């Protein structure tokens, strides 16, 4: 609610109802005031044939001249910009971590990337990138010749971090499964930020 006071907005939540129902049905709820902060929250539950036409149902609720952001908190389409709700948005937010196969989700996002697409896995490595960059200011002042990124197999943020390091250093980057850590190899020492 505090954020909504600084950035008032309208939030439209689209949730699937019974897709297999014979009759189209729209259950809607509007929240204003205390329940929504300075926001208006519209909750739409689409059932039956209507479930396949979410963008048509959402369009009348959009505010004119207001940026639209579509966020899939769970499983997102392979190409978010091609999804009917994604086509309405200037920014599309996904989270590969919640996908059935997180690494495959990241790979499919790369193939279908369109300007305006963001995956929260990239945001999760912001502090790691800052920490690793600041580690370069410490002795020994030598180039990085290798790197190791270790952690959960199912965490795509670590795969993205390994890819980011591979694009930045002149050396091999290894992705391992194990304890969470990053090692930066240099000719005379290995740096492990903590």
Pin down the residues of each PLM region.
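ATP/pyrophosphate-binding catalytic subdomain of soluble kinases
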Residues: 120-175, 180-182
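Acidic, Ser/Thr-rich peripheral helices and adjacent loops at domain boundaries
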Residues: 25-34, 86-98, 183-193
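Structural alpha-beta junctions
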Residues: 4-13, 62-68, 87-93, 166-177
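Short, solvent-exposed polar/charged micro-motifs at secondary-structure junctions
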Residues: 21-25, 80-81, 104-105, 156-160, ...
């Amino acid at each position: 609610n505090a954020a909504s006071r600084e950035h008032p907005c309208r939030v439209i939540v689209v949730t699937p109802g019974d897709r297999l129902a014979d009759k189209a049905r729209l259950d809607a709820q509007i929240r204003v005031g205390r329940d929504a902060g300075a926001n208006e929250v519209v909750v739409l539950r689409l059932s039956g044939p209507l479930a396949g036409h979410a963008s048509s149902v959402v369009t009348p609720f959009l505010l004119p001249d207001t940026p639209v952001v579509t966020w899939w908190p769970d499983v997102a389409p392979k190409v978010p910009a091609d999804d009917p709700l994604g086509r309405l948005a200037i920014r599309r937010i996904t989270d590969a971590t919640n996908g059935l196969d997180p690494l495959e989700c990241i790979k499919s996002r790369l193939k279908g990337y369109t300007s305006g697409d963001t995956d929260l896995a990239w945001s999760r490595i912001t502090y790691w990138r800052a920490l690793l960059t600041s580690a370069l200011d410490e002795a020994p002042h030598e180039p990085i010749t290798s790197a190791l990124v270790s952690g959960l197999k199912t965490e795509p943020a670590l795969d993205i971090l390994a890819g980011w390091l591979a694009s930045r250093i002149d050396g091999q980057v290894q992705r391992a499964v194990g304890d969470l850590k990053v090692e930066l190899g240099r000719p005379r020492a290995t740096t492990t930020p903590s």
